[in-house]
Regions:
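Core SAM-dependent methyltransferase catalytic element
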Residues: 130-143
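Conserved beta-strand signature within the Rossmann-like core of class I S-adenosyl-L-methionine
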Residues: 101-107
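Conserved SAM/SAH cofactor-binding pocket of Class I
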Residues: 1-66, 72
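Short beta->alpha hinge that forms the Motif I/post-I loop of the SAM-binding pocket
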Residues: 32-34, 86, 109-110
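A short SAM/SAH-binding and catalytic strip from SAM-dependent methyltransferases
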Residues: 71-81
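Conserved class I S-adenosyl-L-methionine
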Residues: 109-122
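A short glycine-rich, Lys/Arg-flanked "PGG" loop and its adjoining helix->strand segment in the class I
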Residues: 88-100
Length: 143
């Protein structure tokens, strides 16, 4: 049962959204609060012929629809200092925007204990991959 709709939350220049398009996702929405990032994402969508929508907004606050999949590589830290408020904002948005049977994937540095914080928002949290300095955390609303 392949997910249909995908949200890149905090898309930056759109790397994850473009990669998702290359994997066959057709309904892609990318959002960020940085104008330069949104401009770069729009250009990358055009260059790679991604059929997607790029929307300005703060952690998905302007979105109402729910998505089958959410991908996020959030700026949770500066150096080794972790921004707990920003982490909570992205997790709250993901919980609100994720379809009941959907899954969200977060790319984070290994030293960020996202798994622990995510359990406050999602009944199912697990690390699905690790490479170098990064790990991939999957969360879902179904336990």
């Amino acid at each position: 049962n392949r997910p249909q709709s995908l949200l890149d939350l905090g898309c930056g220049y759109g790397f994850l959204a473009c990669a998702a398009a290359q994997q066959g996702f057709e309904q892609i929405t990318a959002t960020d609060n940085n104008a330069a990032a949104l401009n770069a994402c729009t250009k990358n969508f055009a260059a790679l012929e991604v059929n997607g929508t790029v929307i300005s907004g703060d952690a998905g606050s302007q979105l109402e629809e729910r998505f089958d999949a959410i991908i996020c590589n959030p700026p949770f830290h500066q150096g080794f200092n972790i921004d707990s408020e920003l982490t909570a904002k992205f997790l709250t948005a993901s919980k609100r925007l994720l379809a009941p049977k959907g899954r969200a994937l977060f790319v984070v540095n290994n030293f960020i204990a996202l798994e622990k914080k995510a359990l406050d928002y999602f009944p199912r949290v697990r690390e699905v991959a690790r490479s170098g300095s990064f790990k991939l955390i999957m969360v879902s609303l179904k336990g």
